[in-house]
């Protein structure tokens, strides 16, 4: 839940987020829609604990997000190649995450031999599957998907979104989905918020 979030990139400049509040239930898939530059990604970074708001607060079950250890709010980034350590094999990257079971890998179509490769050796769609697996650790309660499929072909997009809808429903994980595509949000989300 976010309460009265205010954020500006520079003091005295127009705020990117001006007293934004929202809440997401554990079974909801909430779409965030808005043009470029309206603060969608900034809000998602704040909700996932990557960025601090100038004022306002983010909390889970009435408490602030943890400052260390595993965060139950996980973010999947737009550019998977920037989210993975290029010096680790993808198998090593998965081991850094929170208990990823093989069924999750199978559901995402992750081939066992991909885990011996490095991020630069896989396609964007293959790499995004690893980013999703890392974000879906056993302790994840909320998932933030920030334009995660815009660079993918339509078949891969469909596979990934269908998997995410099934997995988040099965595990009662709340999901925030950022997209410029209203059609995508209409298909995936239970409700939408326009910034």
Residue ranges and their predicted role:
Residues 16-17:
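Conserved structural motif at the start of ABC-family nucleotide-binding domains
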Residues 48:
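Helix-to-loop junction immediately C-terminal to a conserved catalytic motif
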Residues 56-69, 100:
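Conserved ABC transporter NBD signature motif
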Residues 132, 144, 160:
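Hydrophobic anchor residue at the start of the ABC signature
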Residues 33-35:
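The feature captures the beta-strand-to-loop junction immediately N-terminal to the Walker
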Residues 118-122, 126:
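Conserved ABC ATPase signature
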Residues 79, 86-101:
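Q-loop/switch helix immediately C-terminal to the Walker
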């Amino acid at each position: 839940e976010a309460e009265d979030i205010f954020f500006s990139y520079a003091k005295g400049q127009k705020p990117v987020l001006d007293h934004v509040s929202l809440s997401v239930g554990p079974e909801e898939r909430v779409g965030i829609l808005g043009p470029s530059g309206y603060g969608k990604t900034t809000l998602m970074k704040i909700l996932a604990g990557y960025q601090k708001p100038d004022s306002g607060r983010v909390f889970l079950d009435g408490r602030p997000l943890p400052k260390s250890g595993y965060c139950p709010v996980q973010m999947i980034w737009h550019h998977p190649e920037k989210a993975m350590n290029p010096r680790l094999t993808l198998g090593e990257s998965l081991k850094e995450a929170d208990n990823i079971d093989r069924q999750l890998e199978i559901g995402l179509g992750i081939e066992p031999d991909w885990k011996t490769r490095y991020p630069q050796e896989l396609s964007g769609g293959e790499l995004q599957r690893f980013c999703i697996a890392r974000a879906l650790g056993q302790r994840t309660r909320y998932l933030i998907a920030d334009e995660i499929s815009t660079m993918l072909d339509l078949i891969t997009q469909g596979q990934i979104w269908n998997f995410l809808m099934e997995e988040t429903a099965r595990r009662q994980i709340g999901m925030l989905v950022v997209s410029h595509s209203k059609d995508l949000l209409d298909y995936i989300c239970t409700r939408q918020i326009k910034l």
